[in-house]
Amino acid sequence: GGNGGSATGALAAVGGAGAAGGDATSGTGGFGGAGGSARGLIFALGGAGAAGGDASTGVGGPGGPGGTGTASSPFGIAIAIGGAGAQGGAGTSGATGGAGGDGVFEGIAVLGLGFGGAAGAGGAATGDGATGGAGGFGGAGAGIANFLGFSVLHGGAGGAGGTATGTGGNGGAGGGGG
């Protein structure tokens, strides 16, 4: 799937969403597109990643990562949010979920909010000995407030591991938080 476009705004910007990967009857599902990055003075939201394609017999496509949101405000207020990662595709082996995008405010803000995007879950796997996909890693929240300022930083949640259905199957590992 195609990647979302990046965005730069005078005050606010939102990155474009990625497009989903195609499904496959056998073989490998398509990669999910990545979310576009965003840069705005006061507000920035990274685009969401898109889901990986499923494979009936084979490996699912990886979920697309979320885009980075970056805010750099001369006005002292900056809100930056990373885009969400997407779920990995299902298959005989599940694919990895997409990572969440980082939310970063730059400079020395009076009020700065940086929130990492949540990660996508690993893809489900079906069949004997199947392995679920690993969950993606959550995005980071980053920035520094000045000595009179106030900041809130929050890392994104990691993605759940993919389920496995079948004899001798193994569920996927969960992703770490941002």
Label the model's feature ranges.
Residues 1-178:
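Glycine-centric low-complexity repeats
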